[in-house]
Amino acid sequence: FGSKLREEKAQGIEMMLTVDVSNSMLAEDFEPNRLERTKYAIGKLFEGLQQDRVGLVVFAGDPKVQLPITSDYRMARAFARRIDPSLVSVQGTAIGKALEQALLAFSGDTEQSHGRVIILITDGENHDDDAIAVAERAAQMGVKIFTIGIGTPEGAPMQIGGEFIKDEAGEMVVSKLNEEMLARIADITGGAYVRSSKQSIGLDEIVKAINEMEQTELSTVRFEEFNEQYQYLLIAALVLLLLEFVVLDRRNPLLAHLNIFREK
């Protein structure tokens, strides 16, 4: 009785969502802005999962593992709601570093990479590194990268604390979607690129493609609760105690005069 750990095995996919939290994701060409729309879509994705594992990497100039690989979707939704630019101290958009971190964040044997995908959500404005080289390495490992471009080619200004971000000349900075690199990353790894629209961020299309992939065996350790059985043990103990009194009543002359178990 009580609880114990129980290992469950199921077929599924490991998905590492890699989310851009740089200032450019605050652009308002999506309502209320790119990042808030992304967070909402991720939360809806987690609500519909059953046997897959998920993790979260957030990035700007540097990446950070926000949520290690897990099958606890309630916890995953809670972490998704907390996605914010303040999670990363260095601004910029280093997509290559983020993909590298996502590859390292998968669980278990890195040599067995089928059934593992990275979903990269960004506006594609890569400033700091060579994301293509990391994509080529992911392809060699058998990890597919699905990319979602959020933003518009025309772009939009960004606000922080109600103030528009401006360049050194005092002009408002406009963040535009860079699709070329995102499409190339997906193509190199055998994934797919989707451009977000006002109606859908694109996760539904990505998940449909992922569901057609070869799955892998995933082990999950869970706490298993049992019904308390102490009442039955208590009854058995009382029966044994009564039997002991019967024996004592018959054999012990000091108890015989009490006549507890004798008819008068």
Segment roles from a protein language model:
Residues 182-213:
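Extended, hydrophilic extramembrane loops/domains of integral membrane proteins
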Residues 46-53, 80-87, 102-110, 122-128, ...:
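Sec/Tat-exported extracytoplasmic proteins
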